[in-house]
Amino acid sequence: MAGKKHVFNSKILNHSPVEQTGVEERTIRFTKRSIKGSSKMQGLHMILSMIDLTTLEGKDTPGKVNQLCTKARHLHDHIPGLPTVAAICVYPSMVSVAKKALQGSSIKVASVATAFPSGQSSLRIKLADTRLAVTEGADEIDMVISRGKFHAGEYAYVFDEIAAVKEACGKARLKVI
């Protein structure tokens, strides 16, 4: 993995500052709370502005992506003041279609990469997938980690993989899923 070398510190995994009883008590309190009036609307606006509208089917077509982009651009037409969604999320092969359809809007184009949805591929393939999405115009990359390596306790491998993908993103934002 070329470029800036990041060092994984495994000691962070040995420190667990979570107090289980406190988490459970707060969870119960949150489930009983009711948000009312303008606070509820502010919350809904905030949620909408953070959502990615997504089409990630094997049968995606440029027409389907264009349709989703049109929906995203005009979602707020009937309710003045409603924010747009944060992004449209597509496969790397559909990034340029979404980018063109969203031109002139503030809506970002996100792309899954790194062998979505399984993450079961070599680092070389994951980096190529990421670079393709960025080259096609993706503003954000949704990365799937090597879950098998993570569950096997190979955290340094996963850390290095994330660092390499981040480097391949260039200026695009990386989101690890």
Predicted regions, residues:
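ATP-dependent carboxylate/acyl-activation modules
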Residues: 34, 56, 70, 139-140
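Conserved alpha/beta-domain cores
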Residues: 57-75, 79-113, 120-121
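Charged, compositionally biased N-terminal leader segments and the immediate start
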Residues: 1-49
